[in-house]
Every structure is written in structure tokens, then in C-alpha cells.
Amino acid sequence: MTENVYTFSMIKPEAVQNNLTGEILSEIESNGFKIIKLRKISMSYEQAQGFYESLREMPFYEELCKYMSSGSVIAMVLEKENAVKDFRELIGATNPAEARIGTIRRKYGLSKSQNAIHGSDSDESAERECRFFDL
């Protein structure tokens, strides 16, 4: 992947279950991102553990893995210049209550863990996360 052009995103289980996928995808596209690849996935608990390996020592790790394996997610590769930075700005802070008004997490997130969407935090993470899901 070319740096600064691609990022990885994942619509989380509660947003998929609450039928917010279409609204979130529209918002992503209307902010200049092109959806290059998209796949609906049901992660096993073990897959969630692998995806969040870097958070293994955190106190919320087990709960996060249970949650992320509780339903389908939408994994996708997005394209735009400065993709990682711009997408992080679009989705907002991890905690929806602290996210800027107008961001995806502020609009659709329920809590710090059930915050509707994941976005890579670096070009390296984006590449690793895309590879993890064979995207």
C-alpha cells in the first residue's frame, strides 16, 4: 500500500446491528473517501484477540474481544490523500461524549467501546489491519 493514501476502517457490531451501516458509509463517501474494498465479517473471539493483540495488557482487552466477536462487522479499505489523518478527524475521539460534534462517533457511538467505528491510527497500522482481513 502507498503511504498516506489508504486506511483501514471497521464498522463495529452495534452499528451494524442498529442498521447504521448505510448512513455511516454515506458519510464516509461524502467526506471524500473512496471505498476500495468492503467485506462483512463475523469475527471469532480468537480473531478479535489477534486483531487487538497490541491491547492485550489493557484492562478492557477481554471485554473488547467479546464485544467485537458478538456480531458482524464491516471491514473496509478507504482511499484518500492523507487518509489516516483525515479519517481519524472524521470519526472523532474514542469516547463519543468527548468527540467533536459532527463526527461519526459523536453521532452514532454509544460508549467508549461501542463507538460505532474503528479507524487505523497510523499508516503502519492500516497496512497491518488490511493484511489481517486479507483486504
Predicted segments, located by residue:
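Non-catalytic terminal and connector segments of soluble metabolic enzymes
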Residues: 1-135
